[in-house]
Amino acid sequence: MTGASSGIGEATARQLSAAGFEVALIARRGERLETIAKEIEAAGGRATVLVADLADESQTTSAIRRAIDALGQVDVLVNNAGFSPGAAIEQMKRDEIRNIFDVNLFAALQLVGEVAPLMRAQGGGRIINVGSLAASIPAPLAIPYISSKIALHTATDALRLELVPWNIDVSLVIPGFVDTAVFDNAREGAQHLRQDPDNPYRETMFVLDDLAKKNLENALSPDDVARVIVRAATARRPKPRYYAPFSALLQSVFMGMLPARILDALLTRIYQLDSR
């Protein structure tokens, strides 16, 4: 379970443990993982803590191999880790963009590559990638995040075909708006840009902040999404895609049906991007 120190990852780890799984918790914040592991064990479960920065290939390799050593086998891999800095492309360096892809996409694919041989030897397994509704909704100031999630969605569909001969099921869980620290972290990471009066994107940042606050009023909790992930992990025949909530599917379909020019006009109005 990656990204297990908070939000969807933490909630899913707790629910998977309650469902009878022994869980391996992967994230950067070791102290927080230790607390979660102790609480899981106090409730009768078993948890292994694996501290790793998934942007680092060697740490990612070490984490999954330690997980395999600790668990003996891997029945379910949940790729949940992800982040978004909330800045314009011209305000980001290439290394910063690469770092987003390292965590949101490349680490997930690397982990699949590590567990696939083991799952094949076991006679099967299950891989669950956590995507985002943002992959269906173009937005400014989140281009690397959106791009990484679009790539993860497509990769998940291709992985499902690549691994089907060995009884390895691959599912994509697509959450809508979820009340997690992702939005706060994105705001904090770009706070210096919000405070810069010469930042040409400052007004757009405030508009997006207001939209995020409104969306969070009716957002799902991490536990809501975790229940969907557990369903994908335990279903006899898991679906290729799960949406949380169902309205996320409707939004995705609606956005996909609109001609590009109409979609641009709609989003330009929503994001208040008319010529300034």
What does each model-found stretch correspond to?
Residues 112, 148:
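Active-site helix of classical SDR
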Residues 164-216:
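C-terminal beta-strand-loop-alpha-helix "lid" module of Rossmann-like NAD(P)-dependent dehydrogenases
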Residues 132:
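Residue(s) in the substrate-gating loop at a strand-loop-helix junction
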Residues 30, 51-62, 94:
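The beta1-alpha1 cofactor-binding region of Rossmann-like NAD(H)/NADP(H)-dependent oxidoreductases
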Residues 5-6:
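Conserved glycine-rich cofactor-binding loop
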Residues 88-89, 96-98:
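Substrate-binding pocket helix/loop in short-chain dehydrogenase/reductase
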Residues 19-36:
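Conserved glycine-rich Rossmann-like NAD(P)H-binding loop of the short-chain dehydrogenase/reductase
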